[in-house]
């Protein structure tokens, strides 16, 4: 965010000083015509864990947050599925992580995040929303929920 703030300040100053010449989009010289971005559907926002490393999963969440929001399904020990939207994550590089299906790690970590082991590291979930509930911090979620026996749906 700091880089963006510096860039905005620098750009505004260059405009004030007359160092920037604006070019209308219609006059830009490109080899390809401009294309609109593809429409995002609910299915597009599902995190398909088997297709992601820790880096791509983190970037997927960032790209869809805050709206429409990336989501996944958690499986309870009795087989019940729960939809969870994920809004904010960080990543931790780690050599010993999941190779095939991602693993939901126990919540006994100091920063109180929901952790998922993926190829290339651990994804720390900081903000989430369960179906029918309000958006919450992972620490609040973990205080009221025992995740023993829960799994991430990796189908």
Map each language-model feature to its residues.
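C-terminal active-site/capping subdomain that shapes the small-molecule cofactor and substrate pocket
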Residues: 58-155
């Amino acid at each position: 965010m700091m880089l963006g703030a510096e860039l905005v300040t620098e750009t505004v100053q260059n405009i004030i000083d007359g160092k920037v010449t604006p070019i209308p989009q219609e006059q830009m010289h490109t080899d390809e015509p401009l294309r609109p971005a593809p429409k995002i559907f609910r299915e597009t926002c599902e995190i398909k864990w088997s297709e992601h490393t820790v880096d791509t999963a983190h970037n997927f969440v960032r790209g869809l947050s805050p709206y429409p929001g990336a989501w996944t399904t958690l499986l309870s020990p009795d087989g019940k599925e729960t939809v969870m939207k994920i809004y904010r994550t960080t990543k931790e590089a780690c050599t010993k992580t999941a190779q095939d299906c991602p693993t939901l790690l126990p919540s006994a970590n100091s920063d109180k995040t929901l952790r998922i082991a993926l190829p290339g590291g651990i994804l720390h979930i900081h903000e989430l929303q369960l179906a029918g509930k309000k958006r919450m911090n992972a620490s609040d979620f973990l205080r009221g929920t025992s995740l023993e026996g829960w799994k991430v749906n990796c189908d």
